[in-house]
Amino acid sequence: MGGKQSTAARSRGPFPGVSTDDSAVPPPGGAPHFGHYRAGGGAMGLRSRSVSSVAGMGMDPSSAGGVSFGLYTPASRGAGDAERAPGSGGSASDSTYAHGNGYQETGGGHHRDGMLYLGSRASLADALPLHIAPRWFSSHSGFKCPICSKSVASDEMEMHFIMCLSKPRLSYNDDVLTKDAGECVICLEELLQGDTIARLPCLCIYHKSCIDSWFEVNRSCPEHPAD
C-alpha cells in the first residue's frame, strides 16, 4: 500500500475571502489599494473591500467594477441567495464571497434599508445606510452660528461669520438688586435681593458673573440673539 496522496487544500486565513498566499502581489504600476491580489490575474483577480460591500448589497461582485455611484436596496434573503451567489453551484470561494462577508455574517443581511454606494475609492466606508445619510447631508444645507445661534444659509456663512466676529460685545451696567427679580436664564438660579447684576441695553438682567462667562463665547443677549 502506498502512501495516500494528500489533496491540496486551499489555505484559509483568519478572515474569509482574504488571501494569505505569499505570492499575492499588487498589479505592476498600480497604486496600493486595500484588498488582495493574486499573480496571474485569474478568476480571483482584484477584490477590494468595496466589492465585498457590493456583494453584501446583493449585487454580483464580478460586475462591481461597473457599479456606479447611487442608491441600492439589498436583495431579500432566503431562496434568492442561491441565485445571487456568483457562480452558483461553483467553488466554495464563490460561496464565501456571497455569504462570508461581514455584512451578512453579522446579521446585516436582515437590514432592509437601502444603501448609498460611494464607489470603490470611497474613504472610511463603501456604503452608508440611508437612515444615516440624510442627516449627514442635511447638515450641509444650513448652518447654526455658534456665536449668535442664528440659522444661516451655507452661501452666507462666511459673511455672517465676519459680521459676528467683528461685532463689538454688548456693554452693560452693574447694579445691585433691591428686590428679588425672578430667574437668571443663564444659570437658572434666582436673582435675589443684594445680588450684583448686569443690566444690558435691552434691559435684560443677569448675574454679573453669569453674563461675563456668557460673553466669553457669545456677543449678544441670551434672550435677544438677533439684536
Swiss-Prot record:
N-myristoylation targets ZNRF1 to intracellular membranes. Phosphorylated by SRC at Tyr-103; leading to 'Lys-63'-linked ubiquitination of TLR3, lysosomal trafficking and degradation. Residues 1-38, 77-105 are annotated as: Disordered. One of its GO terms (biological process) is positive regulation of toll-like receptor 4 signaling pathway. It is found in: Endosome; Lysosome; Membrane; Cytoplasmic vesicle, Secretory vesicle, Synaptic vesicle membrane. PROSITE patterns: ZF_RING_2. InterPro entries: Znf_RING (IPR001841), Znf_RING/FYVE/PHD (IPR013083), ZNRF_ubiq-protein_ligase (IPR051878). One of its GO terms (cellular component) is cytosol. Keywords: Cytoplasmic vesicle, Endosome, Lipoprotein, Lysosome, Membrane, Metal-binding, Myristate, Phosphoprotein, Synapse, Transferase, Ubl conjugation, Ubl conjugation pathway, Zinc, Zinc-finger. Pathway: Protein modification; protein ubiquitination. A zinc finger (RING-type) spans 184-225. It is a peripheral membrane protein. The modification Phosphoserine is found at S50, S52, S53, S123. It comes from the Eukaryota. It is an enzyme of class 2 (transferase). The modification Phosphotyrosine is found at Y103. GO terms for molecular function: ubiquitin protein ligase activity; ubiquitin-protein transferase activity; zinc ion binding. SUPFAM superfamilies: RING/U-box. It catalyses: S-ubiquitinyl-[E2 ubiquitin-conjugating enzyme]-L-cysteine + [acceptor protein]-L-lysine = [E2 ubiquitin-conjugating enzyme]-L-cysteine + N(6)-ubiquitinyl-[acceptor protein]-L-lysine. Coiled coil: none annotated. Its EC number is 2.3.2.27. PANTHER family: E3 UBIQUITIN-PROTEIN LIGASE ZNRF1, E3 UBIQUITIN-PROTEIN LIGASE ZNRF1-LIKE PROTEIN. E3 ubiquitin-protein ligase that plays a role in different processes including cell differentiation, receptor recycling or regulation of inflammation. Mediates the ubiquitination of AKT1 and GLUL, thereby playing a role in neuron cells differentiation. Plays a role in the establishment and maintenance of neuronal transmission and plasticity. Regulates Schwann cells differentiation by mediating ubiquitination of GLUL. Interacts with AKT1, GLUL and TUBB2A. Interacts with ZNRF2. Interacts (via its RING domain) with UBE2N. Interacts (when phosphorylated) with YWHAE. The RING-type zinc finger domain is required for E3 ligase activity. This is E3 ubiquitin-protein ligase ZNRF1.
